[in-house]
Amino acid sequence: MPKDILEIGKKDLEYYLQGIGTKNKFFSDSAYAILEESWLLGEGYKSYRKWLNLGGLGKWKNNWDCDNLAVSFKLYLQMLHAKHNPYTFTDRWKKKVENMTNVESVAVGVVYYKIERKGSSSMHAINMAFCPQGYAFTPEGNFHTLKRLYIEPEDGTVKKLTKKEEASIWYANF
């Protein structure tokens, strides 16, 4: 996991979800770690694929398809986050130890959207992640800006969703 981790609260994460079609947005935690794009698509994704291969799930199947891949990529990143931040509140207080971050989760979710092609349509599940993009300097203060990434969990590539596809997102879970 990266050394310097930005954090974002649920309300701020909701702000960055503006423009997607769904009202079905679910947040299971109150704060999230923002992962660097280069780590997420590089080392993070490569180690995820190794983990899948160890379990014999390295290839797409009818019963191991897009939704399973998207959920498992999110889960894998959450497992790494928990492993690298092992101390509970009690541990930190009694043993005087620190985690890299104390947020509950990573800012990688699962989204479902509609794909329309020449007279047919289907649903597809991918991952949505928020990564650092730069800085904004305002009278209210300086802050990091984030960018929304859509990741195809089958091959680890960034997908460019059209406005219509973003508007068709019917479920998002972080």
Model segments located where?
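A structural boundary/capping signal
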Residues: 1-174
